[in-house]
Amino acid sequence: MDGDILSLSGDIPGVFEARQNRSVRTRDGFINAGIGALQTRRLDDLKIVELAMVSGNSVGSFYTRFQDKDAYFRALSAYASQGISREFDSAFTADKLRQLGPSGGLDALVDLIGAIFGSKFRGVLRETYLRIMDEDDPWAPFRTTAKQTLQTLHEGLDDAFPHYGPDETKTRLSFCFQLIVGVIQNDLINKNHVFTLEDGSVLVGLKQTLRAYMGVPLTRQENV
């Protein structure tokens, strides 16, 4: 999750294409600064002068890369969605799920989603999620990745639960995914829960819940 800045599409509204190395470094510096700042603050609280200082750029250079702060946020969100999609594509495949089997496959999904929502993108995810009702729907790219991930889950574990029929297995796996995403998304904005992502307890709870729901025996350690 900590690779280089991805090449951003030139069709992001208000984001000016960076062609020269200096322009790319300026853009990347501002994006990295924003990713870090959003871990603890809201976008509306970020000052461009502060982002410039952290990134080692000038305020004027901000406007050579981004039309305004809304465009800047679109760039942050695009970078996060591309990075997260790439992570799912490499770490979560139908072949890997078949190798892991029912319990290992469910655990892998919980761990991967937990890792992504606890990564450097956490602040961008939170800000984007809080803007889900905006007219431009900034959450749409993440929703697309979720649909692709669910399809992979179905393909990889479609015959891993023989005690259920094919249709019920698909429905139950869909609910497993809904449960994981719903609980961990809620953790983005609400800390007042008995289990949290910060201490990892919510991941343990989710794994136990999914195994029980899918009729997979708990491990000896989980039964203790």
What are these regions (language model features)?
Residues 71, 75, 89-120, 176:
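Hydrophobic alpha-helical connector segments
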Residues 38, 73-87, 142-145, 149:
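Alpha-helical DNA-contacting segments of helix-turn-helix folds
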Residues 12, 17, 36, 42-48, ...:
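Short glycine/proline-centered loop/turn elements that form peptide/ligand docking sites
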Residues 29, 37-71, 75:
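Helix-turn-helix
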Residues 139-143, 158-208, 220-224:
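Hydrophobic/aromatic-rich alpha-helical bundle segments in the mid-to-C-terminal region
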Residues 1-25, 218-224:
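N-terminal intrinsically disordered/low-complexity leader segments
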Residues 25-34, 51, 76-88:
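Generic hydrophobic, amphipathic alpha-helix propensity
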Residues 103-105, 121-152:
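Short secondary-structure transition hinges
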